[in-house]
Amino acid sequence: MNVLVQGAVHALGYYEDGKYSREPDCYESIRDLIRYLREDGDDHTARIECGRHNLVEQDLVPMVKCEDLTDDEFDIAIRLMVNLCQPAISTMRGKPPADRDQWKMYWELEENLRRAKTAFSDAHFFTAIKKRIDNYFIDTEYEDRDERLRLVVERIVLLIKYVFSINPDTSEGRRTRIEDSSHDRVIIAFLESGIDKTLMHIANQPREKEFHVTILDIFALILKEQTAEDLATKSEEVSTAEQKKTEEEFRKIIENHVVKETQKRKSFSRFGGSYTIKGLKGISANSSQVVFKPIQNVEKHNFLDDRKAKKRAPRNRRPFEIDTNSHFASSEVRGMLRDMVIRIIETCFNRLMKSSKTTVFVQVQKTSQINYFFLIKFVLRFVRLSRQDHLLERISECIGVEAFHENNVQLTEYVENATTLKGVEAKSHGLKAQYALGAYNELVLLHRYIYEHAKEENERKFAKRALEHIVNVEEYRELPIFIIKKFSSSVLSNNFLRELVLTTHHYMKLVERFVKTGALKKVTKKVKVRKATKKSKMSEEDVRSEFDGMSKKDLDRLWEESKGLVLQILKKEVPEMRGMNPIDSQLDVPVDAQQKFAKLSIQRSLRSRGFPAAVGLYHASRALWPESFKRGLTDFQDSPGEEDQLQELEQLLKADMKKVAKDLKKAESCKTCDEDPAYKKYDKMDATALQSLWEQSTDTLARILSHELPESESTSPVNWQLDITPDVQQKFAMLAIQRALRARDLPAAVGLYHTSRKLWPGDEAIFGAPGIGVEEEIAELKAILEADLHEVAREMKVAEDRAEDPDEEDPAEPYDSEQEEEEEVPAWKVEEIDFQFDSYVCKFSNVDVLKWYVFLLNDFSKNSTELNQALVKMLHRIAFDLKLPIKLYQVSLFQVFSKVNEHFTHLSKDLRKSSRLYELYQFGFHLLKKFFSKFTGDLAIEALFWKGPRECFEIENGYGSWVKSREADIRVWTEDLEIELRNLYEEYRTMETRDGIDVLDFIEHNLSRARSRKKVAKKLIEFGFDLLGAKWKNSDKARMDSVLPIGDIQKWYDEWKEAGARGDLVNVLQEKLNEDLGMEISRKKILKQLAHMDILYEKPKKEKPLPQWDTGLIEELKKLKEQYDDIPDALNMLGVNIVRYVMKRLSEKKPTRQVERHLESLGATIPERSKKSEKNGKKFDDFLNDDDDDSENDVGGGSEDDEEEEIVMKSKRIIPDSEDEEEHIEQEEAQKKLEKVAEKPNTLMGMIAGRKRKLAQLESDSSDESDDDDSAEKEEKKLPAAEDDSDLEEDAVIYKRSYVDALLTGGSIAGNGITETRRDTSEEREDDDDEDPFTKKLTFKRRIVMSDNEDEA
């Protein structure tokens, strides 16, 4: 391959006198190189050879600059350059190197790319490719563009992206910091050619979305080695700042050199050898430590510590850094890049980012996502630092609430993926999360800058709205805490952690400012939705009752304003409201009270200015009670007296009816407690009526009880829809019996009476003991008839009204996934809460947060000043603002303070205050001061570990104080808790439906602090509250039997069992219960009741769906079934059942079970299969397991058994016909040969051959398709292949051929059936109906003779 590549490279052309000359076969040579690269193996020999010759710089770039280059040559040259310049990781198919050889290959590919990059620092090259792009996009109309040229342009744009994606050469020699690197020189050539303007033009075209993502990558890669600060600052300011920075660096270098020189001690001859240190013991306690090297400072001598083996973290778990590769470019490069960034913002930034957004995130382009967030961060930072406010409108696509939301979503997703995935993929998501976090940080800073410094009010309002959004919504407030708790140093870099700390610092400063200015008092928070209990529907009190308290002055004013309108209504100039009913039929009050309530209703209508309704109600009342409305009565019948009626209405308006209003409210409150109107006349029967009714019903009752007349058995004494206790159910059953007796429905009454006795056969015998006589039953029924059950009737009415609500759910019913889907209540809701800044800061005092802050603080000397300030500010908030310094009593933090103190030891006070570490030094001083003021032996031990809330509390108040305070908190009922208890009690009392939950359960589960049921009950009794029937111990277990009708379930279960237990028991019970109760009962509830009744439920197996057949095959099956059914007595005539009949004639072979199932679906009767004999299975195993050893051991002992078996086998044989005699003889000869083979010596190969022979015999005997030629040929091939011995193979082939020939020439079924001698043995076998003459399984040493006249049948 190397020779071919070298030959092709030398055949391209040569560079002479500043001009590149192409060889005649240059085009074909490039094609050959492309083919070599395409056929290159995993060692990438061709690519590496091209890189060694630096083909891009020596040949391809000069070739492209040639003016006489044809289109085809240009196209193929660009193709080869794109292929050679693709990233090394793409060449290795995106997989990182796995071993040393692959790493060596990878670095060689990278080095070749770096050498090739310098070739693109020629502006003429970019000018040449710019002409091609301009010719396509600018000079050619959209409709006239050629698809082939478009492909060339795509390759050019991709080539530019590959060129700028080549990693910089770190070993490149640079004399000064601002000397142009290879990357900078390529940028200069790129910008001088003007191709950047062409790319901006393409990015601004909405039709060219395919190029936008690649152009975005190009701009991001150009700017990746620059910082926004360098480009945003003007050149004069940069020069001054750079001069100062350079002087400062030189000063530091000199100081460090001086310090190092002064720390070196001069060598003295007396310290040239080994010596001991006084006061410092060695390994042995009796000897001093011996030193063999010079010591700079004896106090810092840690000789023993250096010898300890340090614990090393695995390589894949170590914290890592991501190099940004940024450098300070020359003023020329910075100026050109600054102008380019401004042009991007002004011409195409919004369009480019909007069109790229969908492509980048929808199509999941990993590298482009990083470049997308980098460009957002760079541009936003550039606009903020350059203070060019006129550019804010040009970046509107990447700012605002929507930008925050999109960034938040992507950042959360990246962090989740980074912490859940593993390996390179996890680090890839971590890298994307780093750039997304940087963009989020710049969004916060830019909006804050606009809010503080923008000149236009609209821009300030826009920024304020976005900032208020991110501080109000919980997702943004919890984002820093969420990320830092998820942080893992193995997949997220230290760069990410530093960016996160800075972002948190800026966000908290923003929140703190909003709190101090009063702009942030309420925030939104997601809370779990507790399913609200339904409030009672209070008696619908007249809304006009609010006018009952009107003063006399107001009434006089009202009448003066409205009497004219009332008079017009009375004169019928204005229509009154017709059909008014002054009587409330639901109120059980006397007529006098109804008249008063009607007048009150008229008064309220007048006072609420409902004059048409008031006049209509007045006329309706006067028609009902003329004696109570006497004024104007004489005129009413002939001509109405409007003036008299007006006076009476005025009196009603001004009358004092407060007492009547109280009576009305009392009557309405008792309305729901009244008896059921349907049974009202029966419930209020007096003693005389009851005596008369009993005398008339005694004879009929006696006849029913004596079984002379039938009783009703279809009635149930209990309404199972009511959620009540068993005792109350018994009362309701007695009321049902009483109402049936009083309604003269005697059969139903007796049926209810007997059913109730079966349901409650307890010791109390409320409905009589089992086996009592007729006279005793009559006496008990008379007692039930005459009993006073008015209170029971009211309770029943209340319970029935409570059960009428269709939305009410059963609290005892567990969740059933098979029920119909109900409307789901959202599990979370957003509500406003008071925002406490200290509570928010307290969330950062978590150990998982603090350990990473201390981790970054260890590198305080390398950190930027801004990062150190952010770290110290957070620790200061926790230690001093929250007054939790104990949280920071940690040895790892104290070691940082020790290093800082060492740094400040040799500095004067003036230098200390000007130092960038002064804030850290001051914070450490005050924190250690607090620590040593409380220092004890226990505190020294506690400083070794991170501390949670419990540990901090116990350090402050003593060990064990945490538990004691919690216990004291549990025992004490605070005033707020008592108020909450009262409110919950009142809430329970006003509930319309209590879902079977008593007051103690309700309060126990809704109280803000945990209190036991017993303590809640004691507190309610202490307050003098009624427990409303609740017991101190929950009695849900005792109510288990009252959930469903046990008697009916047992009866239905017995019926289902007697019917053969067909179908699903739960489905049967569910249908019965739905019909009986009129409500849906869940499967889980029925299963629970069955378990309680000790009824074993087995879920029926689901019937498998029918196998999928073709429509034509199913139609053929139907015709065969009809054909079989048309034959009279088909089973005896044909000798086969319908299954075998169909299988023989079906055009396509199908399994027997599938044919049976399809026939069953068509209504055919399928004969049952008999179980196979266990003895046959045993013989099968014996046949496989016996070997020559067994036969030898059995010699002499089993001769009688062998003789009997031979007799049996002879009786089983079928005598062959004369025409089959020859085949029969051949079969017997083959059998004898096999028997001779079996008599070979007992060797290992003989045993294996015998075992294989027996397996082959079994396979040939159990074949279901013995009449198929193909299968026979297949079996002929299988048998000899299974044997190793050549003689055995030959014998087996002879035997198999004779056996199959005998089977195939045996004929088919005849009309007279099959003649077969029955077996005389007692072995079990399958029934004759199951034996198929067509595909019958033939056992060894058996033949079946069949006639050939199959068609005649």
From Swiss-Prot:
The residue ranges flagged as biased composition, category Basic and acidic residues, are: 1150-1160, 1168-1182, 1227-1239
GO aspect biological process, one term? DNA repair
Q: What happens when the gene is disrupted?
A: RNAi-mediated knockdown is embryonic lethal. In germline cells, aberrant segregation of chromosomes is observed during both mitosis and meiosis, resulting in aneuploidy. There is a weaker mitosis phenotype in somatic tissues. Weak seam cell differentiation capacity during the L4 larval development stage, including 30% increased seam cell fusion and reduced cell cycle exit. RNAi-mediated knockdown increases the survival rate and partially restores alae formation of let-7 n2853 mutants at 20 dgrees Celsius.
Disulfide cysteine pairs (residue numbers): none
Question: tRNA processing: is it a keyword of this entry?
Answer: no
Q: Which UniProt keywords apply?
A: Cell cycle, Cell division, Developmental protein, Meiosis, Mitosis, Nucleus
Spans of biased composition, class Acidic residues? 802-825, 1183-1206, 1217-1226, 1261-1273, 1282-1291, 1323-1332
GO cellular component, as recorded: nucleus; replication fork protection complex
Predominant place of localization: nucleus
Q: Where is the protein situated, by its record's location annotation?
A: Nucleus
- Which Pfam families does this UniProt record tie to the protein? TIMELESS
Quote the function comment for this protein.
Plays an important role in chromosome cohesion during both mitosis and meiosis. In prophase of meiosis, it is involved in the formation of the synaptonemal complex (SC) and specifically, in the diplotene and diakinesis phases of prophase, it stabilizes the association of homologous chromosomes during synapsis and sister chromatid cohesion. It regulates cohesin subunits to promote meiotic chromosome cohesion and localizes non-SMC (structural maintenance of chromosome) cohesin subunits to chromatin prior to or during pre-meiotic S phase.
* UniProt protein name: Protein timeless homolog
Q: Which organism is it from?
A: Caenorhabditis elegans
User: Could you tell me the gene encoding this protein?
Assistant: tim-1
